[in-house]
Amino acid sequence: YLDHGLGAPAPYPDPLEPRREVCELNPDCDELADHIGFQEAYRRFYGIA
């Protein structure tokens, strides 16, 4: 058990996070992502994810 008083470690950076944010800002992409998943929705709107 290691507790250095720093809280939880930072999660590993998600390489898809910038694309996920782009999709979330587009209401149509965001809605589609709710149904088929972010990566497929992004691919349909913007090309290869």
Curated annotation (Swiss-Prot):
Residues where Ca(2+) 1 binds? 17
- Location of 4-carboxyglutamate modifications: 17, 21, 24
The record's subcellular locations are:
Secreted
Q: Where does Ca(2+) 2 bind?
A: 21, 24
Q: Which GO terms describe its molecular function?
A: calcium ion binding; hormone activity; hydroxyapatite binding; structural constituent of bone
Q: Which SUPFAM superfamilies match?
A: GLA-domain
Annotated Ca(2+) 3 binding sites? 24, 30
- Keyword line: Biomineralization, Calcium, Disulfide bond, Gamma-carboxyglutamic acid, Hormone, Hydroxylation, Metal-binding, Secreted
Q: Record's InterPro entries? A: GLA-like_dom_SF, GLA_domain, Osteocalcin, Osteocalcin/MGP
Is Metal-binding included in the keywords of this UniProt record?
A: yes
What SMART domains does the entry give?
Answer: GLA
One BP annotation, GO = regulation of cellular response to insulin stimulus
This protein is called Osteocalcin
Which species is listed as the source?
Answer: Sus scrofa
Source lineage? Eukaryota, Metazoa, Chordata, Craniata, Vertebrata
From the UniProt record, report the name of the gene that encodes this protein: BGLAP
